[in-house]
Each structure stands twice: as structure tokens, then as C-alpha cells.
């Protein structure tokens, strides 16, 4: 069997819509908090810690849960499963909320989320991704850099599977795009064009 680094699934989340593999999964016109709760409930899982997460971690959790819904126990070594994520605003959304909270009483619950890579920890714990775990701050979604970095890890047999993409939220404006990358036969090839097409198809 000829295996290639391929895009198995993709998820796109905007302010009111979630797309899974290009198909509309959820549409709800409501405020962000209500939208995230509806999305979580649609997953039909019980994970109480979700309610304590900041918005960026909730977005990453929901997107990765959809990607992994049929792959919760994969055949891959947990130490060869990785996360490579980008965004533009780091954890500024939560930083601003924490800054507002310390005008009164500082919120420890918010403080623990004032690093952008905390979302990776939430995703890694849920899906046992114990390999490469990297968060890049970029001007915008950069398919070329995602592919360049991830391809090296696959070529060197450091990873067998990865969740990669972009998790951006600022002032309640959401732009999330994640893909599950695996060694597969006859799947969508892991190319800049394919990744950019998937990202832009639901803009």
C-alpha cells in the first residue's frame, strides 16, 4: 500500500457556523458563549472541564473533537501524534478579560488561560497527543509554513498523525480551521493548495 501524508478531515468554525469536511454541521445565530455551548452539546459527550475553559480552548476542543470523533483510539503511538497550531492574536482575547477582572478581584480561572498554547494542552489531554506540540504566532493563516514544518516531522518519522491549523479569536470574532493529517492511501494530499482551498472554501 502506498501511503502519503494526507488530509483526512477538516473543520472550519466562524462566529455562527461549523463546517465538517465542507458540509454545514451547525448553524446558530447567537452570542459566542451560547454558540459554543450549543456546539459542545451537539457532540453528545460529557466533559465537565469544557465549561471552565476560555473561548479559544473551547474552540480548539470542539474542532478537535469533530476531527477525532471516529478516531478516539487510533492505532498510532501517542508519542507520534502532534499538534501544530497558528494564530494572530495569541491569547489576547483572554488577556483582556483577565486585565478587566483584576480591576476588581483577579480571576485565577482566567489567569491559567493567558498563554496561547494552553489550548494545545486541552486538546492533547483529551486525545492523548503526546508528541510535538507547537504554537506559532503569524500575521494570518499560513498554509505554507504549516505544511513545511509538519512535513519535516512526518519525513523524520517523528509524527504519524497531527492536528494542524489556525485558532484565532479576538473581540468575539472567530476564525478557526483545523485539519487531521495522517499517513493514508487515496486521501486528499497534504499540499499548500489543498490546505488553502479548504481554509477559504467556507469564508
Kindly give the residue locations of the regions a language model identified.
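Conserved "HGTGT" condensation-loop signature of ketosynthase/thiolase-family condensing enzymes
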Residues: 1-159, 163-203
